[in-house]
């Protein structure tokens, strides 16, 4: 196995990633596979922060008949459920973890405190950041970019259901072209589906590369941190 390319990473998992092929709820076997890969990262000496979406339970934009703010807060609560599920899965493997939330719920998690999060990472604890940014109208992608900047992560590992960034939906178009490398400006100008524009701009301003790869094989997480050719790398230099 190659030496790790990064010392501190931010892993962004969609809620759908925890649901596996089900698309809703939890696939505990698949969640365990992801946790096993995270454990390997820790064993390699890599400090791991994680942000989990809530799309397997609720999406703010799904509540079209609801007040947007209320729908977004429901989505934040969904990310907390996912964070606890991931924490439990990791701890069953003997991985020390902490969940920190942007909205205080001290009975189940710590409030987000940057210095405390940094200390946990230095002590080889996986820190799972939940409830997004704590504000409506911001996605969990933006939360991942924000927390990555705050903890000074070397890279955002963006695990998706597709194996990189394409010029159009590869599930709909057989001639979709995959990119190996992109600049942030290209992503924004072409409206490519990496992160939303707020998250992408935040990464660009703070020079945080984004590595987009597929979770069809959980071992891709290891490949991503050891520098293997995988997915699409988005950075300030193409």
Swiss-Prot record:
Gene3D superfamilies: Acetylglutamate kinase-like
Gene Ontology MF, one: UMP kinase activity
Function field: Catalyzes the reversible phosphorylation of UMP to UDP.
Subcellular location: Cytoplasm
SUPFAM superfamilies: Carbamate kinase-like
Location, primary (coarse class): cytoplasm
Biochemical pathway: Pyrimidine metabolism; CTP biosynthesis via de novo pathway; UDP from UMP (UMPK route): step 1/1
Gene Ontology biological process terms from the UniProt entry: 'de novo' CTP biosynthetic process; UDP biosynthetic process
Segments of this protein annotated with the region Involved in allosteric activation by GTP: 20-25
Enzyme Commission number, as recorded: 2.7.4.22
Family: Belongs to the UMP kinase family.
Stored PANTHER family: URIDYLATE KINASE, URIDYLATE KINASE PUMPKIN, CHLOROPLASTIC
UniProt-recorded name of the protein: Uridylate kinase
């Amino acid at each position: 196995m190659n030496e790790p390319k990064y010392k501190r990473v931010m892993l962004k998992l969609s809620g759908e990633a925890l649901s596996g092929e089900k698309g809703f709820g939890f696939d505990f076997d698949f969640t365990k596979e992801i946790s096993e890969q995270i454990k390997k990262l820790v064993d390699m000496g890599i400090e791991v922060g994680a942000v989990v979406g809530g799309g397997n339970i609720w999406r703010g934009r799904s509540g079209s008949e609801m007040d947007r703010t209320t729908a977004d807060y429901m989505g934040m609560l969904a990310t907390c459920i996912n964070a606890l599920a991931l924490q439990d899965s990791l701890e069953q493997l003997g991985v020390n973890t902490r969940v920190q939330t942007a909205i205080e719920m001290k009975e189940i998690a710590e409030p987000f405190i940057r210095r405390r999060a940094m200390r946990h990472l230095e002590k080889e604890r996986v820190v799972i950041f939940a409830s997004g940014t704590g504000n409506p109208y911001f996605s969990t992608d933006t939360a991942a970019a924000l927390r990555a900047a705050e903890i000074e992560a070397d890279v955002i590992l963006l695990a998706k259901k597709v194996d990189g960034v394409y010029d159009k939906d590869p599930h709909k178009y057989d001639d979709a072209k995959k990119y190996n490398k992109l600049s942030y400006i290209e992503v924004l100008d072409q409206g490519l589906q990496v992160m939303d524009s707020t998250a992408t701009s935040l990464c660009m301003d703070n020079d945080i590369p984004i590595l987009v790869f597929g979770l069809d094989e959980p071992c891709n997480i290891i490949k991503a941190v050891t520098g293997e050719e995988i997915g699409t790398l988005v950075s300030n230099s193409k």
